[in-house]
């Protein structure tokens, strides 16, 4: 593995406090209606969007998607773009090309066309949307191609491995974390990172993964979400992934939620 580390995996297993297989079976038994995917994807999309500062309320967006209630386009356009990206992910296997296409979809009303699905070429600092405080400095532009290449090599290897449930959740979270730290796009990185995590879970676990309300859990615990990201350090080349345990625990907590 190049960049996704298994150093914390043993501690993660010991501290999990959850049987992922049993929790997933409970999800399978609970969500049997034909419209379950649209409902839970609507929740995932709007809560992921609100982490990034989108103003539309969660219940309003659910009414928009499930009951076809109309709202002003400036409220619905960007969440709807992200919804289309989730639909695309559901219908396609996780590859770098497919992921870049998903980014093009989710940034249709966020970035100009020539920066959609394209890695940035400029420096990037990551800011917390509510306070405007700088969280950390993302990967320098001259390292982006190398770092994303390393990440996608790891993702591809993991997709071909036979992983336990604990390993699937561990690596999904770690991929999410590394992607956020690299922050490869000019915008849409947070939304894309949470979609990437869910997409990896779906490729490993099947359709039931789309019902895991990880985005909602991160939104409901957004201060902890940012604090756990900040634990690694301020500068990309000095990040300490041994401090990632608190972040890695959030996904299984979402499954138990």
Task: Describe each PLM feature range.
Residues 1-257:
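FIC/Doc superfamily catalytic core
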